[in-house]
């Protein structure tokens, strides 16, 4: 481990300066000494931090690229759609600290990887299910403050609205990483982002932030919305 300069930029999210001019972020290690995806562990004032790799996390990429609204913070209850093997959910769990993060994944094999890498994080609740069918996991997931979605499906925006109706508190927040090529490979990504935004607004969201996450992910846009219901 090595010495670094640390500055809090959002609640429980930190910029880390190694003195080389590169922009990096990190979260405090909820489980000190435990890596999830081979990330670098560093320390400052006897506190361990996990460097958050924006090449492996769309939320990390959005923060690096200038995200202004970051609704996930200490005490935030989160539903994470598209947990994959747990890279970003592990950082979300660090930020939320003792608050629950429900991590939904569709593929059983990937869910096994997730459980293996994140089993010590007691606030991460693995949920095997299809994000298109929130009724199937409504007996597990409670009302949440934030929904985060990273699901590569053509109906990405509709999935978020559907889950918000089931689980998101009024005036709660949602964050969605829209992958244009998963919606329609033939259209200009800017058209797709506009269409997906329209679906979100008509579904009951007020969009309060948008961040393009290139060069970390091509044709991806992070949107942040407040749930007003409908």
Curated annotation (Swiss-Prot):
SMART domains registered for this protein in UniProt: Fibrillarin
Protein name, entry field: Fibrillarin-like rRNA/tRNA 2'-O-methyltransferase
Binding site for S-adenosyl-L-methionine: 87-88, 105-106, 130-131, 150-153
Highest taxon of source: Archaea
InterPro entries noted in UniProt: Fibrillarin, Fibrillarin_CS, SAM-dependent_MTases_sf
Keywords carried by this UniProt record: Methyltransferase, RNA-binding, rRNA processing, Transferase, tRNA processing
Family to which this protein belongs: Belongs to the methyltransferase superfamily. Fibrillarin family.
Keyword Protease: no
Single GO MF descriptor: histone H2AQ104 methyltransferase activity
GO terms of biological process kind: box C/D sno(s)RNA 3'-end processing; tRNA processing
EC number: 2.1.1.-
Leader peptide range in chain numbering: none
Cited function: Involved in pre-rRNA and tRNA processing. Utilizes the methyl donor S-adenosyl-L-methionine to catalyze the site-specific 2'-hydroxyl methylation of ribose moieties in rRNA and tRNA. Site specificity is provided by a guide RNA that base pairs with the substrate. Methylation occurs at a characteristic distance from the sequence involved in base pairing with the guide RNA.
Subunit structure: Interacts with nop5. Component of box C/D small ribonucleoprotein (sRNP) particles that contain rpl7ae, FlpA and nop5, plus a guide RNA.
Enzyme category, top tier: transferase
